[in-house]
Amino acid sequence: KNDNYTELGVETSINFPRFMFPFISNDFKRRIRATTEFGLQYNYQMRPEFTRIVASGSWSYKWGLQRQRSQHRIDLLDINYLYMPWIEPEFKNNFLNDEKNYLLEYNYKDRLIVRTGYSYIYNSAGQALMNNAVIGNSYSIRFNFESAGNLLYVLSKMSNLKKNDQDEYTILNIPYAQYIKGDLDFAKNIVIDNRNSIAFHIGGGIAIPYGNARMIPFEKRYFSGGANSVRGWSVRSLGPGTFSDEKGNFMNQSGDIKLDASIEYRTRLFWKFRGALFVDAGNIWTIREYQDQPGGKFKFDQFYKQIAVAYGVGLRLDLDFFVLRFDGGMKAINPEKGKDRYPILRPDFGRDFAFHFAVGYPF
């Protein structure tokens, strides 16, 4: 069996220390003190089953206010082209059949994502956090919103373009995604003394496909598990809902709604080492009932019963400029259908443990 996998990526950007946009007065450009960024990215993936190319171009603005406490970013235009030049015939026949797995079939097709977005970050620590200074209690708020495909959909309607056999409008025979997506996260750090603190965060997000799309593109869907989520699960291995993936297909373990919450006790150990005890909770869900994700749909009378919980310990190496993080998580409450509901009562290290290595704190 050929398991070779190659991925190559390159990206470049150019930044201008001013707000670059026609028809805007010079006085406004001076007052806003924004930077303008143009970026290009290219990613090439070659697997035994397929070859995949993702090419992107972006135009964005960034600026900060109130001694660096607030940061704004506007993605005026972000274009992503997903191109599948080759798919292995047997893989295509076995898995990329609309009747067998619409989720896979949808995400292994050429697709265009033309989006705009806005993000806002507020951190009460401001410049002290940027300088890695010792600070007291602080909190942060993160908000993101993006939409894709709306202008293209209006133009398609006005031009009376014909749809393809999947009931999608296309641009140069390439179907385009249409959706809205929003995320909100709140985090707080409470200092107990000069060696100990407690940090917690709660966040959520939702992505809704409409118009020209029946599904959110995989790149824009949510996942759960991993170093910055519910750490009793490996990355992309939890959810949606009670869904349990016996086939090991990571694309099936993605969703349109996400909830996450964590609390950590953090302490200084010695030298540059820090320790942590943590509890995480969360999951993902779909907004529709997909055949390949049974039990994944979000329901108000069920979702709270499907919250996964994990606990664990962490070791962090604070090198001033960045933090190396080693976390070990254990499953406590498992919502997956057919699995032990409360592994915390009968812990099995081989079954319940997940190790994570990451750079930076989880929140």
Where are these regions (language model features)?
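Gram-negative/organellar outer-membrane beta-barrel architecture
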Residues: K1-R142, R231-G232, F243, V323, ...
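Short coil turns and loop connectors of transmembrane beta-barrels in diderm outer membranes
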Residues: M20, L65-R67, G126, I192-N196, ...
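C-terminal outer-membrane beta-barrel translocator/porin domains of Gram-negative envelope proteins
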Residues: K1, H72-R268, L277-F300
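One-face residue pattern on beta-strands with alternating periodicity enriched for small/polar residues
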Residues: G9-N15, G39, S58, R115-I121, ...
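C-terminal structured "cap/appendage" subdomains that terminate the fold
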Residues: P294-I344
